[in-house]
Amino acid sequence: MLLPWLILIPFIGGFLCWQTERFGVKVPRWIALVTMGLTLALSLQLWLQGGYSLTQSAGIPQWQSEFDMPWIPRFGISIHLAIDGLSLLMVVLTGLLGVLAVLCSWKEIEKYQGFFHLNLMWILGGVIGVFLAIDMFLFFFFWEMMLVPMYFLIALWGHKASDGKTRITAATKFFIYTQASGLVMLIAIQALVFVHYNATGVWTFNYEELLNTPMSNGVEYLLMLGFFIAFAVKMPVVPLHGWLPDAHSQAPTAGSVDLAGILLKTAAYGLLRFSLPLFPNASAEFAPIGMWVGVFGIFYGAWMAFAQTDIKRLIAYTSVADMGFVLIAIYTGSQLAYQGAVIQMIAHGLSAAGLFILCGQLYERIHTRDMRMMGGLWSKMKWLPALSLFFAVATLGMPGTGNFVGEFMILFGSFQVVPVITVISTFGLVFASVYSLAMLHRAYFGKAKSQIASQELPGMSLRELFMILLLVVLLVLLGFYPQPILDTSHSAIGNIQQWFVNSVTTTRP
């Protein structure tokens, strides 16, 4: 019975935030904080109950816990939620970043406190819904539902210095991209249901039953493309990434934390959970294309990041590069690479969130995000530059941080399958170090390039320090002791890989 509450708590909490705004500015913030804390506590409780440290995957049932309630029985649509190791990790990450998102917007947001927190909570509720839903219709419902609050978040509380027009443009761009891709996925879902109905005479949107749908190769390929396009826009895969830098550079800090940390992960999760098991043969045929697109994404993201002057746009492009690695891993079909992808997703969520929070704090102090205006900040502030250094080296995959474990496992697992692609993408890591260090150099070292950067600036408050140090500790823990994560996702990843590999062995020459 815990599962529906994981989704309901953020929705109810968001509604309360919106209604209690009249009692004072502080009330919505505290309600939001308590709400996200509860969600995080619930997800951790589920993790402790799951008994994931037993590594043999044979005896464990597929879902740790399920919730099934008929919704539109005539078409076989039900409110069907289930959780396994993979979705559990994602939900825990969502809860954690939710708490941080509330904390980092504590001082930043002045107008419409209640409505802001309503949108923030509803995004998080929608994301948790995406991770838990295994009814395809419900999945699509949550997938589209994340959009609207995110649109408001960017359009109403966007970047202060820019005039209203640009942030509304960015929000609209984000909305149109994701909406159009969602429609493609809706068509694919409906087509899949029709194919299943023609084969069996049963209307169902249930993921477990749709897994066994018999279909011809051409149909399967088309449906797989429908799903892939929807996930590729969210992930973002390179030709479809146009919304990401704009959305990030205009969104408030909390919005950026959610976008980078969680919304991008829904796409990778969708590919792993739905694309591969539902259309294994088509995915196997498509795999080389998918992997080359990932390689292209790594290099493109790195080069574009190097060229940016706006520090938030730079970080946005780093996440394009990071998700390129995940894309390569997803299409290798190797268990090791899948495990690496899960760790990479979590580590990237933490490190990108850290960078965006630091950006927000930097902006609150010097009121610019243009790196041409910074420089020489290292001696002007306590703590902040050094912590930026940590997150920058974490992003480029420094051993001892979680990002290294993820990237290493991805490259190691892919090497057995596609050595050429792996060797090429390893060079992407070199470019990663180039843009991270360039960012640090432009912002914190050298001469002060403007008036603002030359005076003494306030250090970090306790709240700011707490958020960042929490992320630092988690990243280092993940880097030195990733075993709990690996154990948790082991059986879920094993199932997905089983579906994928069995079909590959039968189709590939």
PLM segments and residue spans:
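Juxtamembrane/interfacial segments at transmembrane-helix boundaries in multi-pass membrane proteins
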Residues: 50-77, 163-171, 182-241, 271, ...
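Transmembrane helix-loop-helix hairpins at membrane boundaries of multipass inner-membrane proteins
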Residues: 1-2, 16-118, 199, 204, ...
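C-terminal ends of transmembrane helices
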Residues: 15-22, 98-110, 152-166, 235-249, ...
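Predominantly late transmembrane helices and immediately cytosolic-facing juxtamembrane segments
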Residues: 238, 352-355, 422-456
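Alpha-helical transmembrane segments of multipass membrane proteins
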Residues: 14-19, 44, 102-103, 125-129, ...
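Central hydrophobic cores of alpha-helical transmembrane segments in multi-pass inner-membrane proteins
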Residues: 4-19, 34-46, 91-105, 123-124, ...
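Alpha-helical multi-pass transmembrane bundles of energy-transducing inner-membrane proteins
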Residues: 23-25, 118, 122, 126-215, ...
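Structural signature of hydrophobic alpha-helical transmembrane segments
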Residues: 1-9, 83-94, 137-149, 220-231, ...
